[in-house]
Amino acid sequence: MPHKDLPIRPLVRAFDPVGPDTLGPPDLDFASLFRERNVPEDAPLTLYPEQLNVPWHTSLPWTRQSKWWVQGEAAGRDLVNRISADKASERGALPVEFMDERRKGKIDELVEDAVSCAVYLYPSSSPTRIELLTQALLLLFFHDDVMERGATQDDATVCDDFVTMIPKNKHMKRYFAEVLECDPILGPGLLRAIGLFVNAGRKKSPFKQDKYATLAEYLDYRRHDIAKPFMIAAIRFGSGVRQTPEETAPFAELEDLYVQHSILINDLYSYDKEMYEARTINGSVVNAVHVIEKLMCVPPHLAKTITRTMSFDVEKKYYAESERFMRDPALNDKQRTYVIALFDCLTGNLFHHATLGRYSRYAEYVFDCKT
């Protein structure tokens, strides 16, 4: 089996949301841009998804995985257990499943989601940064779940401490201190980005807006997704590279393309789960596949195919933009590291979605992984 002597994170199942008659991806030579010539010993693992029996319909050549997934998982589980053990007056609302026999399964799901996201999207992060990013993601997923499934979407959670940047909950005080100790320069940006996500979500809840007149309207709404500041702050914190605003300014278009691709991938891979929850618990469907299906009066399979084709178009634009930077001799080392970190997020986001249990259990085309 591949990687048997390396700390690959175990995979169980993967899935393809479209199926065997999917369109082929564009032929783009990302490998020539991002292949490392001299790989350091502490480098992330490079995974070739098809060797692991993960369906990989994309022009992206590989994904990378952090070696520190065990530490990330332990940190995430520790935080959610500490929060859930608090009195209700101290920790605010919890996901509804925490109140009954579904508690363990829900904790496992949240931790798996956060760890998977952290180790594939931010693979070059140090062990401490992986732990803190896993916890950050878990807090966002935890809060998001309360907002989506709560009766009013106005319930307070521990994440509301990030809005004021003055934590009251003892676990949030500890988290703030650990982030700032790890990186006093980039840490505040990560904490503020979590606060922006929480605050914006209350004012512009995606769960309250699920009808769009045009596809362009939907895509514009998602391009300004409430998660975008966090997505970018997490990349910067994970890489640990401190850059001036002048050094990061040239990458605005590359960042935007990364966000666009991430949104399309998320919508494509989460569609079946969203539709199931719409039928069973009256959940809202905020999804490009659904918008295409309704506006164009096409069946779900065709809407998924169109969504995947749109992601291919973004990959073409991303390749052109990243080629411009990676072949530019004027690019300094810090800027190059950031471009590579963005590419890791692009590939990692796809792998994360394709192997995530909370999505694969609703899928039709599921495969056992080989790890």
Swiss-Prot record:
Listed binding positions for Mg(2+) 2 are 144
Q: Where is the signal peptide?
A: none
Positions that bind (2E,6E)-farnesyl diphosphate = 358-359
Q: What class of enzyme is it?
A: lyase
Pathway-wise, it operates in: Sesquiterpene biosynthesis
Q: Which controlled-vocabulary keywords does the entry list?
A: Lyase, Magnesium, Metal-binding
Q: How is the cofactor bound?
A: Binds 3 Mg(2+) ions per monomer.
Record bears the keyword Magnesium:
yes
Q: Where is this motif: NSE motif?
A: 266-274
Q: What is its EC number?
A: 4.2.3.-
Q: Identify the residues that bind Mg(2+) 3.
A: 266, 270, 274
Query: Which cofactors must be present for this protein to function?
Result: Mg(2+)
What reaction gets catalysed by this protein? (2E,6E)-farnesyl diphosphate + H2O = (-)-alpha-acorenol + diphosphate
Give the GO molecular function terms. lyase activity; metal ion binding
Intervals of motif D(D/E)XX(D/E) motif: 144-148
Question: What is written about domains in the entry's comments?
Answer: The 2 conserved active-site motifs D(D/E)XX(D/E) and NSE are required for coordinating the divalent metal ions that stabilize the PPi moiety of the substrate. The C-terminal WxxxxxRY motif is frequently found in terpene synthases and is important to guide product formation.
The function of this protein is: Terpene cyclase that catalyzes the cyclization of farnesyl diphosphate (FPP) to the spirocyclic sesquiterpene alpha-acorenol.
- What is the name attached to this protein's record? Terpene cyclase 6
Source organism of this protein record = Gibberella fujikuroi (strain CBS 195.34 / IMI 58289 / NRRL A-6831) (Bakanae and foot rot disease fungus)
Underlying gene: Ffsc6
